[in-house]
Regions:
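Active-site beta-strand termini and strand-to-loop segments that position acidic
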Residues: 111-117, 139-141
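Predominantly a Rossmann-like dinucleotide-binding segment in NAD(P)-dependent oxidoreductases
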Residues: 1-103, 253
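Beta-strand scaffold of nucleotide-dependent catalytic cores
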Residues: 73, 122-125, 148-149
C-alpha cells in the first residue's frame, strides 16, 4: 500500500519491540564459562550491562523499508531517552538475593530519528513491564494512516479511498477508521505477492504465526534465483547501530547524535524500496533444480547412512567434552 501511494507521502512512522519477558528470563542460555556468575541468563545480563534499544530490528526494519531508507532517504539525526530501571533491578534482586545498584537499561527506551527528507521515526523497546505484545507499526501519511496493533486498522481521506477503488459504504471523516467491508476490500486489492505465494502454507507450518517460514522461504527464493536479498548490508548497519547511537545520546543527557551515512553518499542513487522477482520461466527452472538437488541429497544420505556418521561424531565430541 505504501509503495502504491495509498497513504500519500509517509511523513512519520513508528515501530517497537514491546514484549514482557518475565515468564522467559530464566529460560535463556546461562554461559557456563564463569562470565555469568549470577546465572541471570545471557539476555537479562545483556540488558543489565547495556543501555539503549538492544533489540531494534523488529520495530525499525519494516518502517525503514516503508520510508525508502538509503533508497532515496537516510536517517540523519537521533535522540534517545529511557526510564529508570525498576523491573530489571527488582528481577536481579529477587534472583540473586542482593541489591542491584547498577542496571544500565531502562524499563522503556524511546528513540526518535529524523531523516534527510524531514521525516520522523519513533522506535520503542520495552521487555520489562506488563503490557500486551506490540510492535506498533504505524504509518502516518498525507492521505492516510495504518496501524498493525492491537489489530490492523486503516484510515484514509475521501480522495485516497476513491483512488484505491474501495467502496464508499458510509461517510468517513478523519476521526474514524475504515469499516470492515472497506478494509477487507483494501487488503484484498493490495495483498502482497509474497503473502499470496507463501501465506497459506506459512500459517499451516507456523513459527511465530508463519513469519519464520515466510522469511526463510523468501531468502531461499532470492538465493535460488540469483536475486538481491530484501535486506542488504547497509540495512544491517543502519538498523543495528540504533543501540550504540542511543547509548551515546542517553549517556550525554539525551543529546542529538548524528547518524552515520554507511552508504558514503550513495543513499539517494536507488529510488524506492522494491522486492526482486524472477521471471516465471526462470522461477520454475530454479524450483525444479532445487527439488532435484534435494532429492539427490536424500538419496546420498540413505546410501551412505550419513546419520550414523553424524551420531558417531556427536558421541566423540560428547566424550571429549566430558573428559575436560
Amino acid at each position: 500500500m505504501a509503495q502504491h501511494g495509498v497513504f500519500g507521502e509517509i511523513v512519520s512512522a513508528e515501530g517497537a519491540y514491546i514484549h514482557n519477558l518475565l515468564p522467559f528470563w530464566d529460560a535463556y542460555w546461562k554461559n557456563p564459562d564463569g562470565s555469568d556468575p549470577e546465572k541471570l541468563g545471557w539476555r537479562m545480563k545483556y540488558n543489565k550491562e547495556n543501555r539503549g534499544d538492544v533489540y531494534a530490528t523488529h520495530g525499525l526494519g519494516p518502517v525503514a523499508q516503508a520510508l525508502d531508507i538509503h533508497r532515496g532517504d537516510r536517517f540523519k539525526t537521533l535522540v534517545a531517552m529511557d526510564t529508570k530501571s525498576v523491573v530489571g533491578r527488582n528481577y536481579v534482586k529477587q534472583h540473586t538475593g542482593k541489591d542491584c545498584p547498577e542496571y544500565r537499561n531502562g524499563d522503556q527506551t524511546t528513540t526518535l530519528m529524523r531523516t534527510e527528507n524531514g521525516k520522523m521515526v519513533q522506535i520503542q523497546h520495552n521487555v520489562m513491564t506488563y503490557q500486551p505484545y506490540n510492535r506498533l507499526y504505524k504509518l502516518i501519511g498525507t492521505s492516510g494512516y495504518a496501524t498493525k496493533y492491537p489489530e490492523p486498522r486503516f484510515a484514509l481521506d475521501g480522495g485516497a479511498i476513491k483512488e484505491s477503488g474501495v467502496p464508499q459504504v458510509d461517510k468517513l471523516d478523519t476521526h474514524n477508521f475504515m469499516s470492515k467491508e472497506q478494509q477487507d476490500a483494501l487488503v484484498s486489492k493490495y495483498e502482497h505477492p509474497i503473502l499470496k505465494k507463501y501465506g497459506a502454507i506459512a500459517k499451516e507450518v507456523g513459527g511465530h504465526g508463519g513469519m519464520d517460514y515466510i522469511m526463510d522461504a523468501r531468502m531461499i527464493y532470492c538465493l535460488q534465483n540469483g536475486l538481491p536479498l530484501d535486506m542488504d548490508v547497509y540495512d544491517l548497519a543502519e538498523w543495528c547501530c540504533l543501540a550504540e547511537l542511543g547509548t551515546l545520546s542517553m549517556d550525554n543527557n539525551c543529546a542529538a547524535v548524528s547518524f552515520p551515512d554507511f552508504t558514503r553518499g550513495f543513499w539517494n542513487v536507488e529510488k524506492g524500496f522494491k522486492h526482486a522477482y524472477a521471471a516465471p520461466e526462470d522461477e520454475a527452472h530454479a524450483a525444479a533444480a532445487a527439488k532435484a538437488s534435494t532429492e539427490a541429497q536424500k538419496q546420498l544420505t540413505l546410501k551412505k547412512k550419513l546419520w550414523e556418521k553424524y551420531d558417531k561424531e556427536k558421541a566423540k565430541a560428547a566424550k571429549k567434552a566430558a573428559k575436560k
